[in-house]
Design a protein with these regions (language model features):
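Catalytic cores of eukaryotic secretory-pathway lumenal/extracellular enzymes that build
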Residues: 6, 24, 46-156
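N-terminal targeting or regulatory segments adjacent to alpha/beta-hydrolase or S9 domains
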Residues: 1-64
Length: 156
């Protein structure tokens, strides 16, 4: 298997275009109820769009995520993204973490440190793991399936 290094590098143009689209969002009329029973409340959606345009720092997030070892490998014609973090602890066991739908490796970001370097978190080194977290086909930085039949059994 040919493992290739991977770094997240979203072009500035794409971030600019996303901010333009978010700024141009046509919000629906105010809902008739003050809860989520009819979907996402207009005020929440407006606040979320504003946050992504004015406050969210993609480059900080990208830098943080790039501190995690990532790579790509090709299987059945599709590039599969993965995260791999090895432990320095003797006797560490490999641990495969898989996300569900919808999801991504980000679900595991906060536990990778304690799993791979438990001593830094005041935990016993006996729980140390080498973490491998593939991104499912069609999710995140993995390629999209190019044919039919990509069901749970095939992906597993």
């Amino acid at each position: 298997m040919n493992l290739r290094p991977f770094k997240i590098d979203i072009p500035e143009r794409e971030i600019f275009e996303l901010k333009q689209r978010l700024s141009a969002t046509r919000l629906p009329e105010k809902e008739t109820v003050d809860d989520w029973s009819q979907g996402v409340p207009r005020a929440y959606l407006a606040e979320l769009c504003s946050y992504w345009v004015d406050d969210y720092d993609w480059y900080e997030t990208q830098g943080r995520l790039n501190r995690i070892n990532q790579g790509l490998f090709r299987i059945e014609g599709i590039d599969i993204h993965y995260v791999e973090v090895r432990s320095n602890c003797d006797g560490a066991k490999p641990l495969l973490l898989t996300h569900g739908w919808p999801g991504s490796f980000l679900e595991f970001e906060k536990i990778i440190g304690p799993l791979t370097n438990p001593l830094e978190y005041g935990l016993d080194s006996k729980i140390a793991c080498h973490v491998i977290c593939p991104t499912l086909p069609g999710f995140g930085f993995s390629g999209k399936p190019i044919g039919v039949g990509w069901n749970v059994d095939r992906i597993a």
